[in-house]
Amino acid sequence: MSAAVGDWNLSWAHERSRLPPDKRVLWGKMPNGLRYAILEHPGVPDRVAMKLLVLTGSIEETDEELGIAHFIEHMAFNGTEHFKAGELASFFQLLGMELGQDVNAFTTFDHTIYGLEFWENDEALIRKGLLFLRDIADGILFEASEIDKERNVILSELRSRDGLAYRAEVASYQTFFKGLTLTKRMPIGTPQSINSLKRNKFINFHRKWYRPDLMVLVAVGDVDALKLDVLFEEYFDTIKKPSTPLPKRNIGRLKTARSVDADAFRISHVGSATIRAASVNPTRKRSESFESKRLAFNQKFGLELLQQRLGETIPFGSKGGAGFINYFGHDAAVASIEVGGKQWEEGIRALDRVIRYTYNKGFEEKDLEFHRSRKLFRAQKLNSLYPKMDPSTICESIVKSITDDTVFVGYDQNLLWETKFLNDLNKKSIHRSFKETWDIDHMAFHIAGEVNIEDGEDKIKKTIAKGRKDPVSLSKFQFQSDFEFEPTMWGKTGVVVDTKSVPEIDAHLMRFDNNVRLNFIESHLEPGVVRVNVRIGGGFFDLKKNIPGLREFALQAFLYGGTNRYEPYQISSIINSAMINFGFDLADHDAFSFRGTMGSEALEYFLGIITEYLHKPTIYRFSYESAIMGAVRYRMSSSIGIQDGYREFQSYLFEGDGRFAWGTRNDYTVVSVNDVRDWLEDPLTHGYIDVSIVGDITKEEVIENMSQTLGALKDRRLEKKNTAPNREVKIMAPAGYRQLEFTGQEHQAMVVGYWPINRYLTLQDRIALQVLSGVIERRLWERLREDLGVSYSPKAEFLSYREYPEFAAIEAKIDSSPEHAPDLAQAILEISKDIAENGLSDAEVAGAIGPIKIKTRQAFRSNEFLLDFVLKRAQEKPETIEDAIAVKNDIVATVTAEIVNAFAKELLHTDNARAAAITPKPYIGLFQTDTDLP
């Protein structure tokens, strides 16, 4: 029997379906209506993820309450019955959590979620967390003074979110979901409503909607479900059962156009335009079943194929996308591309043409097979990872099933079903689901960007109508295919000639007879998966001269040329079908690094592809020119907004140092193909190679794969040619305050603080600096967010730069309004000076050390940590292993307040502190639109 009330479902979805739920989950319901789900999942020892879901959101607001649901989410952290305002961050810190990272909350149209991540399963910690969640349910104080403080914080959050993409999305919703209440209920609210909300409105809204029958507790992790069940009852069954019935939700009524609908949102000075097409229809009411899940999967699969097709058939477009969303019983298929502003007519016709062609003709078998193979691979790998999966991932999937009102059959079971769906689907079934998804005659189109459209709606409709008179056809300029990689003999089979074991961390260090190094740890933390890092040469250390802008496209110039046997698209096909991720970068300044994650069986392919690239590395002129154009397009597309202002700050700090500062488009014009060749060809051909592998594979299998690939290359250098930077890192910007400007959103700004250190640092030193950055962040949070409310999310981070033993820095980033930015920059300098002169308390240091200690203990259960911190550079720099052993032996505990305060005095004094206010240049024309946004 259904427990639906109006538009609310107050029972589990599996109680209204023939689909069986995951039997491993303890499903419960208290007499007051509060539901809970507990899943024992000991895959990560001691880890527990817990969420309180409140099935209410911005859709419940009245016109006078806009933004209040989200505002209440904030107020939960600003004073409750058992936790005073300002105490919560310190409380979580002492428990090993950091506010903002492990404690998260967010509000949507129809629900609000509060989450806790426990790194240690301690009953006292769990009880404290439950007490906090219980306070959220009926113990938020809503003190007027705290409301006023948080009001400014929310205005700061609104300002930080309110960029080009957000405004364009809101405008498109008003076109696609015309008539639905959600178009006027954006969760963040409006400045006017946020400023008008009084205490009584908070109390009334919270009392009305935070009721136990709209609450669900979900916990997943290394727990005893029955014991946690008792704790849930202890803390939550005393919440009073509501005495009034739930009112019907006011979701509005979709206004369906008689034909194609369209609108535009004009934004000046951006150069480009985003074109979206959507088909919105009421969800078909059907009971959930295996077949309904298959249909939903096929619809999603078809849209993924559409996204792939957009990238292959519209050469002048970029960022092609397609997806499926559902709001309040309305399904929406959405597709989009980005084009130059002057190309909007060509772009909208092309987008419409691809959708209509697919509607009429369906997909090609080879496209379907290529995408099927990729998804099968990923589903199988995720399923193998399930036993060791982080509980937060599974917790989120249970919560999503509740908010979607679908049966949770089990994360792993769902992957098995997806595998069956993938094996069963065919061209006919995907084409049929695609046609059910799109109503071609009633589509809605939206354009956002720098477009000059008079009589916007009519002009767009006429453009579409004109395009629909032409025959529908497609031609590809890019190709994807299931291309079989065939390993070859690049040379004689390699042989291991040196080996060393490190029992403290179960590592094996080896060298092949061609001097290629191998570092290996066999780990079963991720069943069936391996992680690899291949470091080649000296990276920036091999760059003979400073060439600004070179780093922004040089690696692409190499990759875009392909190899002697394979074209780039063929290599891309291999990567997409056989690997979880693959990359080539200079994130480590002291090496060119190939990185990848894959199934154990695909290690041979990963190593083979890299060997292909290194066998006869060549930089072609055509690939260099393609990379230059890509860099120019990227800079043009990101030349508006704060990100460009931050690039300006980096250039200000490092004054033309191409390792850190960004080049300009003018810099690109003076970089020649020979500059790229002079930098890359020697290290890629002859340079030192250090391979680190961690994962679920045996040492013998790794050696066999290596011996036939990288171990078979011609002899490489025994040692690195350049083991140190050819010039020291210098901060050229003088200490003190500086204002920088960017072109973009006139209401947004950023403030950055920077404190460099130029001397040799031990491991203990670097940990102490990490602690210091944590205390700086807490001070910024207290003053700028909690006391003044002028910043939403101030951050501070220790930048280790491990490749530069005599350079590191602490950087703080603060979101701001343009008018407040100069004052906040001065506040950073004042806080810095105060810490340098007066020091930190023992409690502050202990609070910052707590999360580091707990997460460090957990880190050795992470293959990513083992690869990046333990193995990387293990033979090049043996002290890396010594540091790893020291961390395992709890070197963090040796960091004292005295050590941290010594660094505070050394780093944070006035002569070493830099602060910049990054503000928008004044100009007219941004965000011109005919639509008033909520």
Segments (PLM) and residue ranges:
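Proteolytic maturation boundary segments
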Residues: 2-38, 224-292, 303-307, 369-373, ...
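M16 family metallopeptidases and their MPP-like homologs
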Residues: 39, 44-61, 67-69, 86-135, ...
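Active-site His/Glu-centered metal-binding helix of metallohydrolases
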Residues: 68-76, 302, 554
